[in-house]
Amino acid sequence: MELNMLKSKIHRVTVTQAELSYVGSITIDKALMKAANILEYEKVQIVDIDNGARFETYVIPGEENSKVICLNGAAARCVQVGDKVIIMCYCSMDEQEAKDYKPIVVFANEDNTINKISNYERN
């Protein structure tokens, strides 16, 4: 049996831009993408901590160390610049692998730089 599991997440980054006229996606600083093991064009789920919106899109890389978090296209309507968001990425794995898997969690500072990288621990 294949299970959909949290692969990684970028926790509490700040939206720096919202570009309604762009063709879809979220632009994420490449340094954050690397830290969270998120690939270009990978599907992500985004939760806006400020307004409760939850939606999906795909990732395009921003310039490394640019601190950019930009929602593009229709997703730009779901956020405001300055909102805090959580970006989550999922993967499929078999049940045996899932039992021992620990997702990557990238904690961000207020300026979207990396504060800490860790793994979820089981309770």
UniProtKB/Swiss-Prot annotation:
Residue numbers binding substrate: T57, G73, A74, A75
SUPFAM superfamilies: ADC-like
The protein's required cofactors: pyruvate
Keyword Cytoplasm: yes
GO MF assignments: aspartate 1-decarboxylase activity
Pathway: Cofactor biosynthesis; (R)-pantothenate biosynthesis; beta-alanine from L-aspartate: step 1/1
Residues at the active site: S25, Y58
Modified residues (Pyruvic acid (Ser)): S25
InterPro entries per record: Asp_de-COase-like_dom_sf, Asp_decarbox
Reaction catalysed by this enzyme: L-aspartate + H(+) = beta-alanine + CO2
Annotated GO CC locations: cytosol
Catalytic activity, EC: 4.1.1.11
Cellular compartment(s): Cytoplasm
Any GO BP annotation: pantothenate biosynthetic process
Cofactor note: Binds 1 pyruvoyl group covalently per subunit.
Enzyme class, spelled out: lyase
Disulfide bonds: none
UniProt modification remark: Is synthesized initially as an inactive proenzyme, which is activated by self-cleavage at a specific serine bond to produce a beta-subunit with a hydroxyl group at its C-terminus and an alpha-subunit with a pyruvoyl group at its N-terminus.
Keywords recorded for this protein, A-Z: Autocatalytic cleavage, Cytoplasm, Decarboxylase, Lyase, Pantothenate biosynthesis, Pyruvate, Schiff base, Zymogen
Protein family per UniProt: Belongs to the PanD family.
Purpose: Catalyzes the pyruvoyl-dependent decarboxylation of aspartate to produce beta-alanine.
Summary of subunit composition and partner proteins: Heterooctamer of four alpha and four beta subunits.
Name of the protein described by the UniProt record: Aspartate 1-decarboxylase
Species in which this protein is naturally found: Clostridium novyi (strain NT)
